Every structure is written in C-alpha cells, then in structure tokens.
C-alpha cells in the first residue's frame, strides 16, 4: 500500500486541492478519485486541508475592569495583576500608569499568560490584515513579543512575529489571505524573556 500510494501522489494532491472548496469528507472524496480513504485523510491532515469548521474560542476574560487608573473612560476585561485588555473611549490620553491612548486598545500579558485581541470571520472570502504594536509604558520594562496569527479549525499560522525592546514596537504590513466563516485572526502579545513588568502595549489591528 505504501509504494502504491506514493505512485498515486499526484492524484492524492488533486483530491486535496478539491477538498479546499468541497464539503465532501475524505471517504467520499477518496471514492470519487478511486483512492484509499485513510491515505487521503492523512494527506488532508498533513497539509491542513478539508472542510472548514468554526474555531472554538477559549480562554476569554470573564472579569470586568472599570475605571482603570481612576478614569471613567478606561475600562476593560482581565485581572488587576494581569493579564488584561482595556480600551480608552475618550479623546484624551490617560496614565494607568502606562499610556492609554485616545480611542485606543491596550493589552498587558502576565509572565505566563499571553493576551490577544482578535476577529472571528463572518464570511467566506478574501481579507487584508495589518497590525501595529508599541510599548505603552516606555519608562521601564524590557519590551515585549508579538504575533499576528490566522487560526483555522485545522491549523494556526503566523502571519507576522517580532520582538521589541523598551520603547519599541512592531508592525505587520498589509497581508491578504483567504478566510472561511468562523476562522480567527488575532494579535497576540507576550512578555519578553518572561518579564512582564511595564508590559502595557498599544494594540492595533486593521482588517
């Protein structure tokens, strides 16, 4: 079976390509192409192809944070001791003690828990994503690390990644990708070298 399957690689790859736009399962696809279902399923798994399913989002913050830094306009979710995500709904910048930008979103990881902001696609189609992060508490700390990820039901792919020092930041230039309904695009921020001190971070993602 091994040698026979290798000899039919081109036919298996044709079936895999068809799976990207076909809701048929591996058994029906294999039957359609005269292939072994188990072997085709292995190809689909290896290449992360197959019918798309909505991504189940876990680890959501459940505790509200209100009047962060004493401001009525800075509120969010998380834990006072981190991790957390907050938004400033006003046209003024506030110290919380890092800088909460006007109309901005700030995130703060813990030493072991990263924090993310994301978007779950309501469509099947093409999108363009870009992102920026910047140190929001540049007077201290050692910087941070960031990722922009495309999370589907079959894989998590990195669209961009970077590490920055104190007062620094990072940017993902516009990237175009195909998404399915239920896929998630997220901006993730973590501590640099496990140190989360002063890691309040400006988080911007545009889709």
PLM regions: where:
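Low-complexity, glycine/serine/threonine/alanine-rich intrinsically disordered linker
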Residues: 1-207
């Amino acid at each position: 079976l091994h040698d026979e399957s290798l000899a039919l690689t081109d036919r298996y790859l044709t079936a895999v390509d068809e799976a990207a736009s076909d809701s048929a399962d591996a058994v029906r696809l294999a039957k359609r192409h005269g292939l072994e279902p188990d072997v085709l399923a292995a190809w689909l798994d290896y290449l992360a192809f197959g019918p798309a399913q909505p991504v189940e989002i876990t680890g959501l913050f459940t505790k509200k944070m209100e009047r962060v830094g004493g401001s009525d306009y800075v509120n969010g979710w998380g834990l006072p001791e981190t991790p957390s995500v907050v938004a400033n709904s006003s046209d003024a910048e506030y110290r919380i003690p890092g800088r909460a930008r006007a109309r901005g979103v700030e995130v703060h990881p813990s030493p072991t828990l990263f924090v993310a902001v994301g978007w779950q696609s309501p469509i099947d189609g093409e999108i363009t994503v870009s992102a920026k992060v910047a140190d929001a508490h540049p007077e201290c700390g050692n910087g941070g690390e960031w990722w922009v990820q495309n999370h589907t039901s079959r894989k998590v792919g990195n669209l961009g990644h970077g590490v920055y020092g104190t007062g620094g930041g990072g940017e993902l230039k516009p990237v175009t990708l195909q998404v399915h309904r239920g896929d998630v695009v997220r901006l993730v921020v973590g501590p640099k070298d496990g140190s989360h001190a002063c890691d309040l971070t400006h988080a911007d993602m545009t889709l």
